[in-house]
Amino acid sequence: MRLPSAAGPRPGRPRRLPALLLLPLLGGCLGLVGAARRPNVLLLLTDDQDAELGGMTPLKKTKALIGEKGMTFSSAYVPSALCCPSRASILTGKYPHNHHVVNNTLEGNCSSKAWQKIQEPYTFPAILKSVCGYQTFFAGKYLNEYGAPDAGGLEHIPLGWSYWYALEKNSKYYNYTLSINGKARKHGENYSVDYLTDVLANLSLDFLDYKSNSEPFFMMISTPAPHSPWTAAPQYQKAFQNVIAPRNKNFNIHGTNKHWLIRQAKTPMTNSSIRFLDDAFRRRWQTLLSVDDLVEKLVKRLDSTGELDNTYIFYTSDNGYHTGQFSLPIDKRQLYEFDIKVPLLVRGPGIKPNQTSKMLVSNIDLGPTILDLAGYDLNKTQMDGMSLLPILKGDRNLTWRSDVLVEYQGEGRNVTDPTCPSLSPGVSQCFPDCVCEDAYNNTYACVRTLSSLWNLQYCEFDDQEVFVEVYNITADPDQITNIAKSIDPELLGKMNYRLMMLQSCSGPTCRTPGVFDPGYRFDLRLMFNSHGSVRTRRFSKHPL
């Protein structure tokens, strides 16, 4: 039975971009239409999978089939440590200040009508389909508010997808609803037919069986794992019984020299809190075993059909995660390595096996890379990211960036939580013991610098303290000591300047390796005044 297409009764019929929207894109791939053996692309995206705390450990088959067959990036970051802003960055190739998705709510532009009108027509899948002639397939979690009645419901199919099997709202494993090319299909709690990771695997295998062989394809498969509620498949629910969350140097300690939200965490954590996060850690790993199976099934199918050697496979996550670091129980959202660093593994034609790249990359680079593979002229986009293709192909004369931007706008309202009256107003994502993971003014921007000379992180907060955090990651990989008050003021000024440049960049100016303005003079007093910097005010009040 042929899979139904998102285009309607005629399978494979492309949904065209509106003519006016298509005009700026024309010319990119047209020269490649009809070219032999254009590569296929498979993008596998997990939900909340860290790189710092052993997130790849359970995925032995994935590491063997993708990482060992290609390249593993050891310095891959997300521009925002939260699902919807990060996923929007993958799709658009833009930093959050340019796509304006700031959190997981409709009000924060997550799958809102504004997002659908302004950003979706220019995502890289839209270009792949309407300009480059690719068959495009999506299955799994899209954006956290996808399917909301106020934003088109499940009938909405974003431009750019030939086959659309999207999850309503946030990650679940059972009792969910899928949009099957715009029509709702409910699932229950029968493992054999409803377990979402396996459902996504089966939909993907069906697509590979029934797709057209005359056009290249792009597949994006977005699993619920290892996001809460961490429901493992029955056969894996006893796995990792002796595993606990890593007790690294920043586990269960007080964030003494950090911004106020981290300082409010209670140290030491209670025994019940530690038992809870250890259980969560184990269950997260258990859910990833089904992802490992999914990867194996897809690679085997591509191999059996003779398409593996012409297919690029990307494996990554939308953000990292923490389990007890600085006494924060479990979540993401924070600026530290455990939340912003993610796995990134790539295999494909021309990529030598068993490589590790230390180059500084971001998920805004995925879209430009995939368009580059398809032959599209990246100069015709307004994407902020850079193509990874020169790195993947081993270009020895490559000039690359030394800085990437991380930015986040806190969730919550400036009111007191009645269940935690002793805390400051505006906290959110609070646990029963009133340890909170977010707040309305947990708004920050960071520049992550990695070069032959420096391995630093510099962050500014838009709060009453106008707090600054700086870390030497080489000397302090667990980010225990904030050196903002002791670092050389000249270096501090350079980092501040780099941050301002990145927060004001757009398109080509984001892709230019950082060069300092020799005329720039830094005034330390401006950083710690009570009014906030021009940069932070602009970010927090940027219109959607």
From Swiss-Prot:
Enzyme class: hydrolase
GO CC annotations, alphabetized: azurophil granule; lysosome
Catalytic activity: Hydrolysis of the 6-sulfate groups of the N-acetyl-D-glucosamine 6-sulfate units of heparan sulfate and keratan sulfate
Textual note on the cofactor: Binds 1 Ca(2+) ion per subunit.
Localization per record: Lysosome
Family under the similarity heading: Belongs to the sulfatase family.
UniProt name for this protein: N-acetylglucosamine-6-sulfatase
